[in-house]
């Protein structure tokens, strides 16, 4: 448990993208009923130099009663730890946009901050089934996140495995379906089955 002397805020949601917005829309009315505070973390550019789409998103979040904070997840681990110290629960909807190593860095910072409850970015693939040495470094990192969480007892953690998001199959970073080259890569082996879902189903 975080022992900070100041009053802790309730819930910090990392990311307001495809999944983050679906989660925030579902979470806001429930949090309001329970008098819980919700903060959405977005990139600084979303606030400082918003696109038309960003402006609409920010307006929706504020209408939902959600506080919005600009913060770069590419920041160093210490900065992340200091941020997370202010919250009881961190819900990670950041995805892989910040690059390799980010999910491990976020997880280490959550643990260092003694956050009471953490929902890691583990939506979709069951990384225990895929295992390590899957051929996809992003998946290997996610497996390592699980091992790190299991190695400690201070922070409660919850994994929500629902099936991979359909759109991610076609993301270049995942290297599963490459439409330009007309290639398809198996996850670990051709015997690995894939279940897909959409974010609004997960958050509903």
Where in this protein do the model-derived segments appear?
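Structural motif
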Residues: 10, 88-89, 117
């Amino acid at each position: 448990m975080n022992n900070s002397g100041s009053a802790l805020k309730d819930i910090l949601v990392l990311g307001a993208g495809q999944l983050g917005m679906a989660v925030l829309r579902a979470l806001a009315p429930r949090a309001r009923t329970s008098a819980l505070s919700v903060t959405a973390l977005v990139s600084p550019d979303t606030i400082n130099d918003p696109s038309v789409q960003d402006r609409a998103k920010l307006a929706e979040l504020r209408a939902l009663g959600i506080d919005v904070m600009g913060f770069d997840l590419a920041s160093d681990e210490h900065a992340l730890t200091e941020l997370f110290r202010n919250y009881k629960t961190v819900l990670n909807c950041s995805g892989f946009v910040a690059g390799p190593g980010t999910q491990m860095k976020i997880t280490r910072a959550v643990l260092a901050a003694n956050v009471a409850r953490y929902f890691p970015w583990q939506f979709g693939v069951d990384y225990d089934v895929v295992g390590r040495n899957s051929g996809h470094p992003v998946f290997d990192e996610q497996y390592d996140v699980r091992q790190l969480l299991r190695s400690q007892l201070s922070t409660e953690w919850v994994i929500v495995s629902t099936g991979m998001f359909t759109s991610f199959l076609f993301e270049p970073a995942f290297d599963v379906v490459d439409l330009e080259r007309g290639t398809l890569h198996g996850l670990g082996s051709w015997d690995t089955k894939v279940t897909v879902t959409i974010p609004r189903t997960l958050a509903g």
